[in-house]
Amino acid sequence: TRRLLAAVLLTALAGAAPALAQTPEAKKEEEKPKTYWEEHKLFAYIENSATFNLSGAGRGGATRGTNELRLYDFHEGYTFNMAEFSIKKDPSEKYPFGYGLVVTAGSDAQKNHSFGIFRDEEDAFPFRNTEWFDLQEAYVSGLIPVGSGLTLKAGKFATLLGYEVIESPNNLNFSRGYLFTLAIPLTHTGGLASYTFTDWFNMTAGVVLGWDDAKNVNDSVSYLGQFAFTPLKDFTASLNWVVGPEQIDARRIDENVSRDSRVYVNSHLRYVLDFVFAYTGFKNLTLALNVDYGHEQSEPFVRGLGTRQDTDATWWGWAAYAAYDWTDKLRTSVRQEFFRDAAGARTGSGIGTDLWSSTATIQYKIWKGLVGRVEYRHDQSDERVFRVRYSTPDRTTQGLLARGNSLDTISVSLYYSFF
C-alpha cells in the first residue's frame, strides 16, 4: 500500500512539473527613459544664522566679535549666509552633453571667490570688501563613447577633496570643520577626465589653474585627481589629491618686481592627499572619516617671519562624523576632529599649533523644505590662537590682542530648500 501511494505521488508531481515550468512569468515593466529636461538637477536654498561666542563672556565688550579659524561662522551675531541656485545636467548615452551653473549670494559667497572672479591678488580673508555674490561653478561636460564612457569636464567646478561641501544642506553640521577651512581648496578652474573601470572603481584626473584660482596667478598649473571605490554596497572610499605651485607671482601686485621672482615662486610645490570614507549600512546611521595631509615648499608666510631656516609648511588632520535619524524629521550629528599645523602657516600663528574640535548638532525639519539647526561647538588649542574679549584689551609683548586657548560657540541656523 505504501509503495502504491508513493508511486501515485511521484506520478502526480512529475505531471505537475511541466505545467509549472510553462507558467508564464509576469513581465517586468520597462523603465521609461528620461527626457532631456528630466535629466536636469535643480537645487536652490537660502540660509540665515546667528552665532554666539561664549568665550570671554562677562568680561565686557558689546561689539560684534569674530570666531577665529572659522569660515562661514567667522562673524559673531546674525549672518545672511547664502542664497544659491544650481542647475546641472550630467552627460548620458542619449544626451551626451552636459553642463553646470551655480550662482550664489551672501556672506558665504563672499568667502568662496576665486582669483579673477570678484577677487584680486591683494584680497585676503575675511574678504569684507569683496562682492557678496559669486559664480561658484560654470562648466560644460561631454560623454565620449569609449569603453564604459569617458566623461570630460571643462570650466569652473567644486574641488574633489573633502567630505564636507560648500552647500550647508548637504553637510551633517552647520559649521565647517578645520579640514574644510584650513586644509583644502574650495574650487578649481580647468579640465577633468573621468572613467569608470568597474562597477566599484572610478578614476578622475585633470589639469587646473590651482587653488581657488580662475586667472592663473603664477603662470603655472596644478594637477587634480581622485580614485573612487565602492567595495561594498553601503561603503565608499576615495583618495583625492592636488599638487602644483600655488604661490602668487609678486609681479601681479608690483610690476617692478624682477622676472626671477616668478621662476622662484613656481619652483615651490604645494600638495594635499585627502582620504574620505563613508558607511551607511546601519539603519538611520551615517558614519564618515576624513583624513588630510598637506605640504608646501618655502611657504610665503613662514618665509616672511624671517626666523626659520626651514621655511616649508606641513599640515595634517582627521575628522570623524556620526549622524543618526531618530525620525523622518529629527537628526542628531556629532563631529570630532584634530588638526596639526606644524609651522603655523595655515592658522597664521607662526608656531606649531594643534587644534581639537568637538561639534554637536540637532537638526529638525520644520515644514517641507524648511530646516532648523542648533549647534554647540568647542575648539581647543595648545597655543593662544583664539581672541578673548576684554573691556580694555590687554596687549602682549608683540602688541597683539590677548588670546585664549579655547573657543565655544552656539549657532542657530535656518535654511529653506526649494527643490
What are these language model-derived features?
Residues 76-83, 131-136, 185-189, 219-223, ...:
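Residues that define the transmembrane beta-barrel architecture of outer-membrane proteins
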Residues 1-69, 413:
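N-terminal periplasmic/intermembrane-space "pro-region" immediately following the signal or transit peptide
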Residues 364-366, 401-419:
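Outer-membrane beta-barrel "beta-signal"
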Residues 93-97, 147-152, 200-205, 233-239, ...:
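Repeated loop/turn-to-beta-strand initiation elements of outer-membrane beta-barrel proteins
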Residues 17, 22-37, 84-93, 141-146, ...:
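Outer-membrane beta-barrel proteins
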Residues 44, 76, 80-89, 137-142, ...:
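Residues on the lipid-exposed face of transmembrane beta-strands in outer-membrane beta-barrel proteins
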